[in-house]
């Protein structure tokens, strides 16, 4: 059984017991969270597709960790001008463990 849900503007395909890295959620480690915006649920041959969400479906999860991702570098380079600008960025994330899928 797996489900596709939406969080932080992105869609994630998950199954029970899986650990997923999401955009930052303002929750403490160990807190439980439910995602109501479930787009699709597949249980064997039974497929439920929402328009746009599946009514009554939920994905339950528990917050495992909060952190920051790897640094990415942004470089702006102007040729022949002896000028360049370099900047770094680390995005915050929340790791959650999927505890259940309710269809």
UniProtKB/Swiss-Prot annotation:
<comment type="subunit">
    <text>Part of the 50S ribosomal subunit. Contacts protein L20.</text>
</comment>
<dbReference type="InterPro" id="IPR018258">
    <property type="entry name" value="Ribosomal_bL21_CS"/>
</dbReference>
<dbReference type="GO" id="GO:0019843">
    <property type="term" value="F:rRNA binding"/>
</dbReference>
<dbReference type="InterPro" id="IPR001787">
    <property type="entry name" value="Ribosomal_bL21"/>
</dbReference>
<comment type="similarity">
    <text>Belongs to the bacterial ribosomal protein bL21 family.</text>
</comment>
<keyword id="KW-0687">Ribonucleoprotein</keyword>
<dbReference type="Pfam" id="PF00829">
    <property type="entry name" value="Ribosomal_L21p"/>
</dbReference>
<dbReference type="GO" id="GO:0003735">
    <property type="term" value="F:structural constituent of ribosome"/>
</dbReference>
<keyword id="KW-0694">RNA-binding</keyword>
<dbReference type="InterPro" id="IPR028909">
    <property type="entry name" value="bL21-like"/>
</dbReference>
<comment type="function">
    <text>This protein binds to 23S rRNA in the presence of protein L20.</text>
</comment>
<keyword id="KW-0699">rRNA-binding</keyword>
<keyword id="KW-0689">Ribosomal protein</keyword>
<dbReference type="GO" id="GO:1990904">
    <property type="term" value="C:ribonucleoprotein complex"/>
</dbReference>
<protein>
    <recommendedName>
        <fullName>Large ribosomal subunit protein bL21</fullName>
    </recommendedName>
</protein>
<dbReference type="GO" id="GO:0005737">
    <property type="term" value="C:cytoplasm"/>
</dbReference>
<dbReference type="GO" id="GO:0005840">
    <property type="term" value="C:ribosome"/>
</dbReference>
<dbReference type="GO" id="GO:0006412">
    <property type="term" value="P:translation"/>
</dbReference>
<dbReference type="InterPro" id="IPR036164">
    <property type="entry name" value="bL21-like_sf"/>
</dbReference>
